[in-house]
Regions:
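N-terminal pre-ligand scaffold of iron-sulfur
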Residues: 1-32
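Residue-level "contact hotspot" at macromolecular interaction interfaces
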Residues: 13, 34-36, 69, 113, ...
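Local cysteine-cluster metal-coordination motifs and their immediate loop/turn environment
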Residues: 29-51, 59-72, 285
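Short, surface-exposed secondary-structure boundary micro-motifs
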Residues: 48, 79-81, 125, 178
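Short, structured interface segments
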Residues: 62-83, 169-175
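Ferredoxin-reductase
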Residues: 86-172, 225-227, 252-254
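FNR/FR-type flavoprotein reductase catalytic core
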Residues: 144, 152-367, 373-374
Length: 374
């Protein structure tokens, strides 16, 4: 049994029980997607009319297209996003932000267009690809073609343990993307931004862009860490305060002392309402808790859960890493306050967008894989 599925104005034939992503691909319309497991939120679409089986992913009038299935005629729409592209570059900077958090700067041969809050699949030569969220420097800037990443060093991590050793300045890097639906959108209501751990990276990108492009919107910013010394983002919070943001909260589960508040970011969420837009990134428990509170208040919520890779560094991997390691690796130096190079990330509106309903040839097939951050 087939039905008419209208996607951004284009009608395609869809089979009963197909996911919306597969139905779109069958009609040469690529709904933006990434993990295909309901985690990344890249494929969230708006149901304009008709009926779909939301498979438990409904939020307001939206569903996840990789999970929701065709059961009747329906019309859906999704936000236009930059087309998926590939770029190559090299590591041009490594700095320590906290005992277990490193800033890695990658400069691309040519810039990649993306929206603040989206993420990329990043492959350091010789290592598995990882999903990383580009951000801006702590003074709100980023140079042309420059990607700034905040990476947590996990014990036994295949990639993160090699930063500063095998992965040094000059190391080759390939990126693919962008992905993710938790990007800054135009609007008028208050913004509530919540970041836990290195989830601060995309939240900081969104915050800096909002201060550049949407200064009319009130901002509430909450940054959290397990331990107070993990609040590596304080310089960016100072930047926001100097720029006029007054509602800034930092939390820590241990070691908190004034002005850091004890507990978790969810303990200090403001009273939410339908006029609020919430962005949250970080550990899945934090993301889930914020989504539940947002849903209960009918606030819009865009989420980016950070999922650690469960695969440890094997003995063979350790031996191979030692063989690849140069004889003398330079030390990782503490981050210094950077000199402004260019005003922030490339503006999201400076991009070529396909017309509604036009297929995105950059996504010819489902990209199905577990997302990993280490």
């Amino acid at each position: 049994m087939s039905f008419d599925l209208v996607i951004n104005g284009k009608t395609v034939k869809a089979n009963y029980g197909e996911t919306l992503v597969d139905a779109g691909l069958g009609g040469w319309v690529a709904i933006p997607h990434d993990c295909c497991s309901g985690q990344c939120e890249t494929c969230r679409v708006t149901v304009l009319s008709g009926r779909v089986d939301d498979r438990g992913t409904a939020e307001r009038n939206t569903v996840l297209a990789c999970q929701a299935k065709v059961v009747a005629n329906a019309e859906i729409a999704f936000d236009h996003v930059p087309e998926i592209a590939k770029r190559s570059g090299a590591v041009t900077g490594i700095a320590t932000l906290a005992p277990d958090i490193i800033e890695v700067t990658v400069t691309l041969a040519s810039p990649i267009t993306m929206r603040p809050g989206q993420y990329l699949s990043v492959k350091f030569a010789g290592f598995p690809a990882r999903d990383l969220s580009p951000t801006v420097r702590f003074d709100g800037t980023a140079g042309p073609g420059e990607l700034v990443f905040h990476i947590r060093r996990y014990p036994g991590g295949l990639m993160s343990t090699q930063i500063g050793a095998t992965i040094r300045e000059g190391h080759r890097v390939q990126v693919r993307g962008p992905f993710g639906g938790a990007f800054l959108r135009e609007g008028y209501g208050p913004l509530v931004l919540v970041g836990g751990g290195t989830g601060w990276a995309p939240i900081w990108a969104v915050a800096a862009a909002a201060r550049r492009e949407q200064r009319h919107r009130d901002l509430v910013v909450i940054a959290g860490a397990r331990e107070a010394e993990g609040l590596y983002m304080r310089r960016s919070l100072d930047w926001l305060m100097d720029d006029g943001v007054r509602e800034i909260i930092t939390t820590a589960e241990t070691g908190a002392h004034n002005p850091v508040l004890p507990g978790r970011p969810t303990h200090y969420l403001p009273s939410l309402g339908p006029e609020d837009t919430v962005y949250v990134a970080g550990p899945p428990p934090l993301v889930d808790a914020v989504k539940i509170k947002s849903r209960a208040a009918w606030a819009r919520c865009y989420a980016d859960p950070f999922l650690p890779n469960a695969q440890p560094l094997s003995l063979i991997d350790r031996v191979m890493a030692m063989l690849r390691r140069p004889a003398a690796a330079p030390a990782v130096t503490p981050a210094s306050r950077p000199v402004p190079v260019a005003a922030g990330l490339p503006a999201a509106r400076k991009r070529s967008e396909p017309a509604p309903g036009v297929a995105r040839t950059a996504t010819p097939a489902r990209r199905s894989q577990a997302r990993s951050r280490v």
